[in-house]
Amino acid sequence: METREIASQRRKNLYLGIELKKFLKYLGPAFIVSVAYVDPGNFATNISGGSLFDYHLIWVILWSNVIAIFLQIQSAKLGIATGYNLPEMCSIIFPRKWNWFLWITAELAAMATDLAEFLGGTMGLYLLFHIPMTYAAFLTGVVTFAIVYMEKYGQKVVEGIIFGLVAVISLAYAFELFIARPDWSKVLYHTFIPSIPNKDAMLIAVGILGATVMPHVIYLHSQLVQYRNKDGSLQAKKEHLKMEKIDILVAMNTAFIINAAMLIVSAAVFYKNGIVIESIEEAHKTLEPLLGVFSSWAFGIALLASGFSSSAVGTMAGQTIMKGFVGLNIPLNVRRLVTMVPAITIIALGIDPLKSLIVSQVVLSFELPMAIIPLLLITSNKKFMKEFADTPLERIMGVLVASFVMILNGLLLYLTLKGEV
């Protein structure tokens, strides 16, 4: 009897080993994508949200993450099912005028993204090593290009670098959470019970949505899965999608925990002490007297890792957008130089990086429908998706997601035009 149990256990262990090996083969694309969900724009909105409104907006991060998981699965599914990325499918399906409109809006989103990510890396270098902002900006550009250049040696190499940087961000904020000692009963309550304290919170809520659900990686994810999309059989595609869903769940929930930690630490440290944070530099300086020098260093390291990794991912997404929509394939170093200009201009003019980051995230939230609607139109089209076309439930979820984003953006626009935010 014992022998049978041992044999059964061995078979289970062997099966689990095979499944784990299979999963590790597919692990990666979602972690590249997840970097965009913990970029410096998230630092800006989450720090502001926590210092101004305590734990009230954690639920926004939760539901933004649920939306992000759904959209990234849809993007990956499109890439696996069709063999094309989302911009390429748009250029195939939509009339030329619409395609150019989608391309321009996608490029604007990429510029807003690059601004946030580039500023994050620059601020990280400035805060940690006191490198002047202008020099730090150029150094950020060099590091970003070096990361993207490693793609020459295979996508797995870039995935490994990005995974390492995400691990650094995770460890830094795990340390921050440990020493901040938040009120976990409040954290739990506000994670599941929605509340918007006032009209000013609406701007931060939409900023959190824009920072957490990123349009450029909706385009990018459909490209990243192509690397492993070598067997065109139906069975292979189904297996690929199954593994990619697990990849997405692991990566995106890691991003959710990091985002929630940012807001929780801000609420537990800044709001609790009646401190309203108005700049990233102020957040860094204020942490030291409240939680110690190691806390401010952890914050700076997390910001630096976030800026470097997300800036590299932004460059990759920009290439996918330009090549897919209009067939242009400019060198990466030229692309990096072009996207450096807005960030360096803001630095040179002395504009507050925190406010620039928040505005960039709001811009991204308005771009979201331009990425979401084409994605959902294509994934529900049986002609292109065949067996992978959306089920009725997925279509309903798609309509709900698109409606939620547009209603939230419409409300913000209305309040902005009235001058109430």
UniProtKB/Swiss-Prot annotation:
Q: Which organism is it from?
A: Caldanaerobacter subterraneus subsp. tengcongensis (strain DSM 15242 / JCM 11007 / NBRC 100824 / MB4)
List, in alphabetical order, the GO biological process terms annotated in this UniProt record.
iron ion transmembrane transport
Q: Give the location in the cell.
A: Cell membrane
Family according to the record: Belongs to the NRAMP family.
Question: Mind listing the UniProt keywords for this protein, alphabetically?
Answer: Cell membrane, Ion transport, Membrane, Symport, Transmembrane, Transmembrane helix, Transport
Task: Name the Pfam families for this protein.
Answer: Nramp (PF01566)
* Record-given protein name: Divalent metal cation transporter MntH
Function, please?
H(+)-stimulated, divalent metal cation uptake system.
Query: Under the GO molecular function aspect, what terms does this record hold?
Result: cadmium ion transmembrane transporter activity; manganese ion transmembrane transporter activity; metal ion binding; symporter activity
The coiled-coil regions, if any, are none
Gene for this chain:
mntH
